Amino acid sequence: SSSAASDVYKRQPIMLIAALCIKLYDHGPVFFKQKRLTIGGKEFYVYKFRSMIVDAEKDGVARLATKNDSRITPVGKVIRATRIDELPQLLNIFKGDMSVVGPRPERPEIAKEYEESIPEFAYRLKVKAGLTGYAQIYGKYNTTAYDKLKLDLMYIESYSILEDLKLILATFKIVFTKES
């Protein structure tokens, strides 16, 4: 969409600074891509600025990041705290893999684990994955997968353009205030 292209253009200085900081810190790759799921279980690569050490999962085991994860670099801590690490996902929105609002895209192997213990988890794939949503606005970093799922399902049940606009505004408020 043209608004996603416009957002990428407006954020170029921030993205350039983030890219330089990541590269200067450890000379590793600036971007990180990872297979995720969107509507209908379709796989796609999500793009982010790399916030962890190179080869953070070299053992091949998929692990969710924790609050004080030792794999997160000092630059990574800053770009995660400010949500700058998510900006490359504007490209995913532009490509049509994601929408601005919707459940966060999950990794296939982690989604499979969740579906085994929470069968309703698959319901999240009825809509396109998003950059922000109820779980990001009303949940906290340490919210359980089940609680995030309940928030995602609330979003799916109450979807509307007006609701999406409210969530986008709430996201900006969170990103640009200290309480987040």
Outline where the language-model segments fall.
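Extracellular interaction modules
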Residues: S1-A5
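A hydrophobic, helix-centered structural microdomain
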Residues: S6-D55, N92, I161, K166-S180
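Residue-level signal for short amphipathic helical patches enriched in basic/charged
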Residues: Q12, T82-D85, V101, K140, ...
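Short hydrophobic/aromatic residue motifs in ordered secondary structure
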Residues: I14-L16, E86, G133
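Short, hydrophobic secondary-structure boundary micro-motifs
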Residues: A18, F32-K33, V61, V101-P103, ...
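Short, glycine-rich, amphipathic interfacial segments at transmembrane boundaries or analogous
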Residues: F32-R71, T132-K150
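A short, structured surface patch at a secondary-structure boundary
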Residues: A65-K128, L167-V175
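C-terminal terminal-structure detector
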Residues: E120-S180
